[in-house]
């Protein structure tokens, strides 16, 4: 599996980028959010990736953060949500906004994405509520402003990678962010969240 790619940005389009890695051009499908932040052609780029292998195709999806990739994996675990639909959702909602929409049962927020109708939006909310349910329980996290979404999402990803369950990780990260306040660094949030989760 290809977990990430670092290379020179050869070209971009409305829905994908091509990275030149050691002379090989990798076509990577990305959300509009990732493409808008990827930088100029010719620059050095690091993308976290998810590779899907099917009988007729091998497809690479690229993300600006591990948190966005984790959200993509959750979305594609829902019946009826393929890679393109997941990217459409992540084009209009960042990982933190998606977590809050699921926790709050806000199907209209999810249905803003192209190709997502009310029924699919409701299925996403229902199927992901248990997997992302801890977000609603984490004090302060559900109401966190968008500016903190990146830190909270990356901290959640870090704790999940260390083996904590989503509910445990969300509660610990939420408590850490509430205690540290605005402007807390990812390192500080993760350290405090680990102490809280270990109690």
From Swiss-Prot:
Which SUPFAM superfamilies does the protein's record reference?
DNA helicase RuvA subunit, C-terminal domain, Nucleic acid-binding proteins, RuvA domain 2-like
Q: Which gene encodes it?
A: ruvA
Q: Where is this region: Domain I?
A: 1-64
Domain of life, source organism: Bacteria
| Annotated compartments | Cytoplasm
- List the residue ranges of the region (Domain II): 65-143
- Gene Ontology BP annotations: DNA recombination; DNA repair
HAMAP family associated with the record: DNA_HJ_migration_RuvA (MF_00031)
Q: Name one GO molecular function term.
A: ATP binding
Which NCBIfam families does the record match to this protein? ruvA
Q: Give the source species.
A: Rhizorhabdus wittichii (strain DSM 6014 / CCUG 31198 / JCM 15750 / NBRC 105917 / EY 4224 / RW1)
This chain belongs to the protein called Holliday junction branch migration complex subunit RuvA
User: Where would you say this protein principally sits, based on its record?
Assistant: cytoplasm
* Function in brief: The RuvA-RuvB-RuvC complex processes Holliday junction (HJ) DNA during genetic recombination and DNA repair, while the RuvA-RuvB complex plays an important role in the rescue of blocked DNA replication forks via replication fork reversal (RFR). RuvA specifically binds to HJ cruciform DNA, conferring on it an open structure. The RuvB hexamer acts as an ATP-dependent pump, pulling dsDNA into and through the RuvAB complex. HJ branch migration allows RuvC to scan DNA until it finds its consensus sequence, where it cleaves and resolves the cruciform DNA.
Q: How does it assemble?
A: Homotetramer. Forms an RuvA(8)-RuvB(12)-Holliday junction (HJ) complex. HJ DNA is sandwiched between 2 RuvA tetramers; dsDNA enters through RuvA and exits via RuvB. An RuvB hexamer assembles on each DNA strand where it exits the tetramer. Each RuvB hexamer is contacted by two RuvA subunits (via domain III) on 2 adjacent RuvB subunits; this complex drives branch migration. In the full resolvosome a probable DNA-RuvA(4)-RuvB(12)-RuvC(2) complex forms which resolves the HJ.
